[in-house]
Swiss-Prot record:
Protein name: Small ribosomal subunit protein uS9
Organism, scientific name: Bordetella bronchiseptica (strain ATCC BAA-588 / NCTC 13252 / RB50)
Gene: rpsI
Transmembrane annotation, as ranges: none
Keyword list, A-Z: Ribonucleoprotein, Ribosomal protein
UniProt family annotation: Belongs to the universal ribosomal protein uS9 family.
GO biological process terms held by the UniProt record: translation
Upper taxonomic lineage: Bacteria, Pseudomonadati, Pseudomonadota, Betaproteobacteria, Burkholderiales
GO cellular component assignments: cytosolic small ribosomal subunit
GO molecular function term, any single one: structural constituent of ribosome
Length: 130
């Protein structure tokens, strides 16, 4: 806890989110913009709000997020992970419910590297018989 803020770091793919929560009216600000403005797609906004809806704290926290790296979906996942960790920092009793929903575990899937002699990670060069 930093002052009256609770903190959580979230990661997904190459995105990293630093999340600060405190008691408030339910405002979510991501990189200085409201969440509805920052995440253009509805799915991104939905992913970000999932841990708050699950715990019933959608209107009870002001959330300040700093996120960088990756794309829109990765950033949404990182913010969700950060909010989850910040909620656990605020009240450890929320951990079982969040863990049951799968929000506490970091999604370890990363992009597979491109191999030499292949066009992509697994896509081989076209074979020519003649």
């Amino acid at each position: 806890m930093i002052g009256n803020w609770n903190y959580g770091t979230g990661r997904r793919k190459t995105s990293v989110a630093r999340v600060f929560i405190k008691k408030g009216s339910g405002k979510i600000v991501v990189n200085g913009k409201p969440v509805d403005e920052f995440f253009a797609r509805e799915t991104g906004r939905m992913i970000v709000r999932q841990p708050l809806e699950l715990t019933g704290h959608l209107e009870s926290f002001d959330i300040k997020v700093n996120v960088h790296g990756g794309g829109e979906t990765g950033q949404a996942g990182a913010v969700r992970h950060g909010i989850t960790r910040a909620l656990i920092d605020y009240d450890a009793a929320l951990k079982p419910a969040l863990s049951q929903a799968g929000f506490v575990t970091r999604d370890a899937r990363e992009v597979e590297r491109k191999k030499v002699g292949f066009r992509k990670a697994r896509r081989r060069k076209q074979f020519s018989k003649r």
